[in-house]
Structure formats: C-alpha cells, structure tokens
Regions:
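Short hydrophobic targeting helices and cationic amphipathic motifs
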Residues: 4-21
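Residue-level signal for mature regions of secreted extracellular proteins and peptides
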Residues: 55, 162, 188-191
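N-terminal pre-ligand scaffold of iron-sulfur
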Residues: 66-185, 220-236
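Second-shell loop/turn segments in exported
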Residues: 180-191, 210
Length: 236
C-alpha cells in the first residue's frame, strides 16, 4: 500500500496492508546491564582461595614499603667534597661495614661561637669534627629526634643500601613522656647498635630490626643518599 499524500489516508477500507507495520517487533536495544558483552566469570572456589592470599600479600607489601621510612623530621645535607671528613667517607663507602654517628655541637672561642658536626666511627673508633659552613647553617639542620643520626652501608644487600637511622632507641624513647628522656644507642664496630636501657640489639645492615632481646620496633629510619665517599650526603 502506498501513501502518496495526505488525501490517500481517507481511503482506509483495506487495512490489511498495515499489518506489516503493526506486527513487526521492535529492534532490540543493547544495554550493558541486560545484554552484557562478556558472560559473568565463573571462577572455581579453589582458584579464588588461591588468589586471595596473593592479593593480600601484594597489598601488605605496599604498606611495608610506605612504612619503611619514618614520618619524623630529619634534614641534613653535608658536602664532603668541601669538608673532606675521612670518618664520614668510610661510612659512605659501600661494603665497608662502617657505621658512624653524627651529632651537632656549638663551640665557643672567646666571645665567638661556631657550630660543628662530630662524626664518630662505631666501636669508639676514629672521630673527626667538621665546622659547619655558612651554607650549612642557612639551610638548617635537624639531626633526628634528639641530635643524633647513624649512617652507613648495609652488607647484606646487592646493590648495597645506604642507611640513615635515628640515634634514639625506638622502644624506649617517648615524645609524650614527662619528663622527656634521651635513650641514645651505642654503635658497635660489627654493624650492630645496642640500647643500655632495654638491652635490645639492632642489626644496622638489615633495616634496623631487633636482633637480640625482647621483640619490639625496628630502628627509626630516614631517607638517605650519597654520591660517594667524598661526595654529597642527603638525609631527609
């Protein structure tokens, strides 16, 4: 049946030809909810039980990386190309198994004063002080919680890892204690540090974990890098 114009609509005596338009079903519309492209996955329970622990392990490992470094404040930049401190240089030499402490003191000479950084090798070995330059004092220095850091390369990683720890025992020092007390660690020549208060022994080559004594927190660790024995040291 052909509709040439509106006048043709007046002759509707035979509507049989319209059945084609009435009876034809509408073209289905695609919906991602009612007609998904991919069928629902049907994972075996055994596979799910295997994948869940792996996912949890990955998530927990990410958390461990984030918690590897302390959120406490530390800031120290030392240019050993200028200072030529041999004690620090020994600690910034890979595979040397030398850890040193650094602290800051104010010295007085007559009516004048100056600041110096004192580096001491573990085990009460060599020590050498370096006078802070004007650049050092202008950019500021924060040697951890209470004026003390431990610096050195670990022996048990390849490539070797350069560590910077706080000198305070993480299991004895409390920032909320009244009065606040200092619990400095003693660095040994064999790559360990001990606390005279709690008797714990920490392994400096493995991230500062407790090696002997009661279980507890590992050493407070800061981000650190060095460009070489007589290069630039950065702790933050």
């Amino acid at each position: 049946m052909r509709f040439s114009d509106q006048s043709d609509l007046s002759d509707l005596s035979d509507l049989s030809d319209l059945s084609y338009f009435i009876q034809q079903p509408a073209t289905p519309t695609f919906s991602p909810l009612t007609n998904p492209l991919m069928p629902k996955p049907n994972l075996p329970p055994l596979l799910i039980a295997t994948l869940l622990p792996l996912a949890n392990a990955l998530l927990s490992s990410c958390g461990k990386v984030e918690n590897e470094f302390s959120d406490r404040r530390a800031y120290f930049i030392f240019d050993n190309q200028v200072q030529n401190n041999s004690v620090l240089a020994s600690a910034m030499s890979p595979h040397s198994n030398v850890f040193v402490t650094v602290s800051m003191q104010t010295r007085y000479s007559g009516q004048n004063s100056y600041v110096e950084f004192n580096f001491v090798a573990g085990g009460g070995g060599a020590q050498q002080a370096s006078k802070a330059t004007a650049v050092d004092q202008n950019r500021g220095v924060v040697l951890g919680i209470n004026n003390g850091l431990i610096l050195g390369y670990g022996l048990l990683s390849d490539p070797p890892v350069f560590y910077a720890y706080d000198l305070q025992c993480p299991n004895c020092y409390s920032s909320t204690a009244v009065p606040r007390r200092s619990y400095p660690l003693t660095v040994k020549a064999n790559g360990f540090a001990t606390c005279a208060n709690c008797r714990r022994k920490y392994n400096l080559s493995t991230g500062g974990n407790v090696a002997e004594g009661a279980q507890g927190n590992k050493l407070i660790r800061y981000r650190a890098s060095t460009t070489g024995p007589y290069g630039l040291l950065v702790v933050n």
